[in-house]
Each structure stands twice: as structure tokens, then as C-alpha cells.
Amino acid sequence: MLNQAFLNLIKNSIESINSATENGLLDKNKSYGQVQVDIKTQNNEVCVTILDNGVGLPKNVNRLFEPYVTIKKEGTGLGLPIVKRIIEDHLGSLFLLPGQKMKGCDHSGAEAKIILPTINSKQL
């Protein structure tokens, strides 16, 4: 199930980059779409960050976790609520944040941050 959650978040990043290109935020001749995945472990947690240079997030970003709410032309608005539920079922947290400016890009995209507890062999 976690695989599905991560794939959905990466797919959202790619779709956001495509929208940024269509809307003129990314100039095909000067910049390119980027999805960056970073994984860090600290204490008893693993933090996965997915950063993109797509269109970014709306001001009411938390509404995206509500069923049937979407900012895309296509889709049902169920992806992020399901992703959040999967992560929470694994005792984790999901945050959507404004992204950082990436190399060759004049705007900020979005950042999805997933924090999950680690499991050691004694817990299995």
C-alpha cells in the first residue's frame, strides 16, 4: 500500500510539471521539469520528501485532503485523501508544503513530506 501512496505522489508531481509547461511557467527551451526524492532517517523515523517544480499548491492546500477536491483538469479528487489515509494507517504523517525554487526555475513548485516510524527487527 505504501508503494501506491508514493507512486501517486510522484504521479501528481509529474502532472503538475506538465501543467506548469502548458501554463508557460516552465519554458521548454530554458528549463525542464524536475522531481526530486529525498529519503532521510533520524531517530526512529524515516522522512521522504518529494519536491517538484510544477504549478505549486493553492492557498487552501488542506482542502486537497478532502474527498472530491482537485485542482487538476482530470481526476476524481480521491488520490490525496487515499494517500493520506494509507500513510496514517502506517502511523505516519503527510504534509503538503510550498516547494523551494529549483535550478533553472523562476517559481516554486510543491513539496510532499511523508514521515513514517521505523520498525526494528524486535518489533516484527
Where is each model-derived feature located?
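Conserved polar catalytic motif of the HATPase_c/GHKL fold
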Residues: 7-8, 12-15
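Acidic ATP/Mg2+-coordinating residue in the GHKL
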Residues: 52
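Conserved glycine-rich
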Residues: 92-93, 99
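A residue-level detector for a conserved hydrophobic packing site
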Residues: 2-3
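Short alpha-helical Gxxx[C/S/T] motif in the catalytic ATP-binding
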Residues: 79, 83
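ATP-lid-like helix-loop hinge signature
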Residues: 14-43, 99-106
